[in-house]
C-alpha cells in the first residue's frame, strides 16, 4: 500500500516535471548571456509583463465596443466597390442617354458634341454626378465615398475599355 499512488499525485508529479524542464531551459539561456548585472530580467519575464499590459487594454467597455463597431462600419461604408461604381456608371449613362443635361463645370457646345461616356467620366471626376446609391442603409452620393478609391476604379475601368477600344 505504501507504493500505491493516487491519480492526483501523478498529475502533480507531471506538472513538476514540466516546470523543472522549463527552469532548465531558462538556466541554459542565462548561461549563454554574459552580463555584469546580477539583477538581469529574463526574456520570459518581459513577455509576462507585456501580456499583463495588453490584457488591460483588450477589455473595452460595451459602450466603447459599440462605438468602435460604428466607426468600422462607417469606414467600410465609405469604401466603394467595383460593382457599385459600375452601377453608378450605367445609371449615369442611361440618364444622359435619355436627355439629362450633363452637370459639368465647363458646360459648352463642345460638351454636347463629346461622347456620352467621356461626359459621364468627367462628371464623376469633377464630383458632379447626381446618382445616389444605398449602402448599409444609407443613401450615398459619389462625394461621400473615398476619392482615391473612386479614382482607382475609374482608371481601372478606363484601361479595360481602352483595351477593348470602347473609349
Curated annotation (Swiss-Prot):
Residues 22-36 have a biased composition (Acidic residues). It is an enzyme of class 2 (transferase). GO terms for molecular function: DNA binding; DNA-directed RNA polymerase activity. Induction: Expressed in the early phase of the viral replicative cycle. Expression seems to continue throughout virus infection. Residues 15-41 are annotated as: Disordered. Its EC number is 2.7.7.6. It is found in: Virion. One of its GO terms (cellular component) is virion component. It comes from the Viruses. Pfam families: Pox_RNA_Pol_19 (PF05320). The keyword Nucleotidyltransferase applies. Its main location: virion. Part of the DNA-dependent RNA polymerase which catalyzes the transcription of viral DNA into RNA using the four ribonucleoside triphosphates as substrates. Responsible for the transcription of early, intermediate and late genes. DNA-dependent RNA polymerase associates with the early transcription factor (ETF) thereby allowing the early genes transcription. Late transcription, and probably also intermediate transcription, require newly synthesized RNA polymerase. Belongs to the poxviridae DNA-directed RNA polymerase 19 kDa subunit family. The DNA-dependent RNA polymerase used for intermediate and late genes expression consists of eight subunits (147) kDa, 133 kDa, 35 kDa, 30 kDa, 22 kDa, 19 kDa, 18 kDa and 7 kDa totalling more than 500 kDa in mass. The same holoenzyme, with the addition of the transcription-specificity factor RAP94, is used for early gene expression. This is DNA-directed RNA polymerase 19 kDa subunit. The lineage of its organism: Viruses, Varidnaviria, Bamfordvirae, Nucleocytoviricota, Pokkesviricetes.
